[in-house]
């Protein structure tokens, strides 16, 4: 019998990868339910398309690499990648976009590096950024939440729009995006950025229907709170650690508060930053990816804080309304450096 001598640390975790991934999938249920409630059945269709695409793409690559397909697919990582991408894109985006983004995420951003545990970047966010850069119009065509929408597509209409671009009655995305004020709606972050650049005051912007929510943007505040609830459950289950979400949210809130105090006429308030866009999804479900995040506790705090700073900078001064995906990928780049300088010193050895 040949024994393999592995390098330290010699740790043991009874939880398998598949179970951790399953817990994350279960924790996503409140967020998915909220998106279905406010944005319609399109989200469910996108999740199904992304899940099937992710499994097929992973199976194809594993077959080509002559690895066990069944054993690898059981780790649920491909399903999670597909789900995270599906809930990040507009619910009525064309079917081929979610398929393209998912296949790119699984094959290029994950399997090309060697598979789970080898990829330096979050695969779902790679797929998202590729779609955002390639198809910016489609990727920013979000429907207004149901509470301010004029035309609410049903399940059949959602399928029709995703696969053909039109509802059963002949309506298109321009019709479906109309709000109660007769104007095509965008996300709270997109609306704020566009309106500020157009010279509108913050007082005027806050009167728009998209900001009719109690805390932040209509619908979006509840979606973010739902993702927050799922994230808290993950913490309770010890599936993730608190360092990254806390440092990310605290840094984002601190930067947003300081910016808002110094320039209230051009920068969004803290509650808009915290409860709009993909803030809570990013904090608890994307940044906490154990493969692409820092591995030390101090490193996790730095990693989360860096991502929070980058999100605020991109949202406030960048060309894109929501900066979570870009912030995640930029923070991923720094992980080796962060881990190098925050790794615990071995007893009896000098630091360095």
Curated annotation (Swiss-Prot):
Bilayer-crossing regions: 20-40, 42-62, 89-109, 123-143, 214-234, 242-262, 267-287, 301-321, 322-342
Main localization category: membrane
Cofactor(s) the protein requires to work: FMN
Keyword Endoplasmic reticulum assigned: no
Residues recorded as bearing FMN phosphoryl threonine in the entry: 187
Class of enzymatic activity (EC top level): translocase
Organism superkingdom: Bacteria
EC number: 7.-.-.-
Keywords of this entry: Cell inner membrane, Cell membrane, Electron transport, Flavoprotein, FMN, Membrane, Phosphoprotein, Translocase, Transmembrane, Transmembrane helix, Transport
Xref: InterPro entries: NqrB/RnfD (IPR004338), RnfD_bac (IPR011303)
Protein's membrane topology: Multi-pass membrane protein
Pfam families documented for this protein: NQR2_RnfD_RnfE (PF03116)
Location(s) in or outside the cell: Cell inner membrane
GO cellular component, one term: plasma membrane
Any one GO biological process: transmembrane transport
Family (UniProt): Belongs to the NqrB/RnfD family.
Subunit relationships: The complex is composed of six subunits: RsxA, RsxB, RsxC, RsxD, RsxE and RsxG.
Database matches in HAMAP family: RsxD_RnfD
Record's function text: Part of a membrane-bound complex that couples electron transfer with translocation of ions across the membrane. Required to maintain the reduced state of SoxR.
Entry-linked PANTHER family: ELECTRON TRANSPORT COMPLEX PROTEIN RNFD (PTHR30578), ION-TRANSLOCATING OXIDOREDUCTASE COMPLEX SUBUNIT D (PTHR30578:SF0)
Protein name: Ion-translocating oxidoreductase complex subunit D
Gene: rsxD
């Amino acid at each position: 019998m040949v024994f393999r001598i592995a390098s330290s640390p010699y740790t043991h975790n009874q939880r398998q990868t598949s179970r951790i991934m399953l817990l994350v999938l279960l924790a996503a249920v409140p967020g998915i339910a909220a998106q279905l409630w406010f944005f319609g059945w399109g989200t469910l269709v996108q999740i199904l398309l992304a899940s099937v695409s992710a499994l097929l793409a992973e199976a194809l690559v594993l077959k080509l690499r002559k690895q066990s397909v069944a054993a690898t697919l059981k780790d649920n990582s491909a399903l999670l990648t597909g789900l995270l991408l599906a809930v990040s894109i507009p619910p009525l985006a064309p079917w081929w976009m979610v398929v393209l983004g998912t296949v790119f995420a699984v094959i290029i951003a994950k399997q090309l590096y060697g598979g789970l545990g080898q990829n330096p970047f979050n695969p779902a966010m790679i797929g998202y950024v590729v779609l955002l850069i390639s198809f910016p119009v489609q990727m920013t065509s979000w429907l207004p939440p149901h509470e301010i929408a004029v035309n609410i597509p049903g399940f059949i209409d959602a399928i029709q729009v995703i696969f053909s671009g039109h509802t059963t009655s002949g309506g298109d995305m321009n019709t479906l995006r109309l709000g109660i004020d007769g104007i095509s709606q965008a996300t709270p972050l997109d609306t704020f950025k566009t309106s500020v650049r157009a010279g509108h005051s913050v007082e005027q912007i806050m009167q728009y229907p998209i900001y009719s929510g109690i805390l932040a943007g209509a619908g979006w505040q509840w979606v973010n709170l739902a993702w927050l609830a799922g994230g808290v459950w993950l913490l309770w289950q010890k599936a993730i650690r608190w360092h990254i979400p806390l440092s990310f949210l605290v840094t984002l809130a601190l930067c947003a508060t300081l910016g808002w105090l110094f320039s209230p006429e051009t920068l969004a308030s803290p509650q808009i930053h915290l409860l709009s866009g993909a803030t809570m999804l990013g904090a608890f479900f994307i940044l906490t990816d154990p493969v692409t995040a820092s591995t030390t506790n101090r490193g996790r705090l730095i990693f989360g804080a860096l991502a929070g700073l980058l999100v605020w900078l991109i949202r406030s001064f960048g060309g894109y309304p929501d900066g979570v995906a870009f912030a995640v990928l930029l923070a991923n780049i720094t992980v080796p450096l962060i881990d190098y300088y925050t790794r615990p010193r071995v007893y009896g050895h000098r630091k360095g």
